[in-house]
């Protein structure tokens, strides 16, 4: 099974997000900030987003911290925050991201 990101269950988002990661120095917590510029659901006029669902062979990671970004009164982007409160959650998230990158031909770089 490949990894997918969905805003509406059953509908994979095709736009690849910009993902920024932050992590506490002691590894006890972290945050992933996803930014989707002009995602499919905006292009299709579907703005009733209830959450972001990260799906892979291990199951599903979910966040409800999702918001639309507007330019000149029109939806332009979606930003979602996924918080990790333990090293185990961080490790699980990184496994998802590795699968997502692999299934979409992407790479990972530290900045």
Swiss-Prot record:
Subcellular location: Cellular thylakoid membrane
Keywords linked to the UniProt accession: Membrane, Photosynthesis, Photosystem II, Thylakoid
BP GO terms, sorted: photosynthesis
Membrane topology type: Peripheral membrane protein
Signal peptide (UniProt feature, chain positions): none
InterPro entries: Psb28_c1_sf, PSII_Psb28_class-1
Database matches in Gene3D superfamilies: Photosystem II Psb28
GO cellular component, one term: plasma membrane-derived thylakoid membrane
NCBIfam families attached to this UniProt entry: PS_II_psb28
HAMAP family linked to this entry: PSII_Psb28
Family named by the database record: Belongs to the Psb28 family.
Subunit structure: Part of the photosystem II complex.
PANTHER family for this protein: PHOTOSYSTEM II REACTION CENTER PSB28 PROTEIN, CHLOROPLASTIC, PTHR34963
Protein name (Swiss-Prot/TrEMBL): Photosystem II reaction center Psb28 protein
Source lineage: Bacteria, Bacillati, Cyanobacteriota, Cyanophyceae, Acaryochloridales
Gene: psb28
